[in-house]
């Protein structure tokens, strides 16, 4: 059985479906509901059923994180496996950018840690970190992986260089600058700081979100309007993603335009 947060990325949900396992979802970050599902499943199967809990280090559309301490405790209590997708936390959180699990010293408790090279590493491709026994099983049994084309040498080289930057002094400096940029924008907008570099500006109406996104684009700022079906109806938003290369001037211009639209509450 796979038990997955309802707001996990579509690729995770589709992968769970392809596995042929029973799929259950729980409301976003509702760990009480997660425990109810775990408890009911274990009682029905006398704890013989293999269970995989799936969540993310930072969620891509809300920019928030789960209570990883509690999830790890639930994993242990119900003898479950744990997969954490660190796509949006890898490179920016934790020791030398290892992600949210590393930030909380929980990496050893996850059975599978996923990360992408297409974001902080500035390349393409992805990785799943796991034990040798699971690695061997995936390589020999995961149909979608077996029949995927291997990365091009140039792509692998670019990812390798990105990883070097993330782990070295330049990576530390970039994380410090990113942290400063996030604090600056949140201060100017009077918003709570997100868990990572993703800051959703909630708009609500889809037409209004498109209008604001277009206004930003006209000023040289690309900030896409996220709307249904990517998010629920009535929860359209402007998805801001900061980087270490943004200047204070860039951030001030962005904040001024957003404040002029009177959408920040």
Where are these regions (language model features)?
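Conserved PLP-anchoring active-site segment centered on the Schiff-base-forming lysine
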Residues: 1-10
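Pyridoxal 5′-phosphate
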Residues: 27-31, 44-57, 87, 92-97, ...
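PLP-dependent aminotransferase class I/II
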Residues: 114, 120-184, 190-193
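Conserved PLP-binding catalytic core of the aspartate aminotransferase-like
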Residues: 174-186, 190-220, 230, 234-235, ...
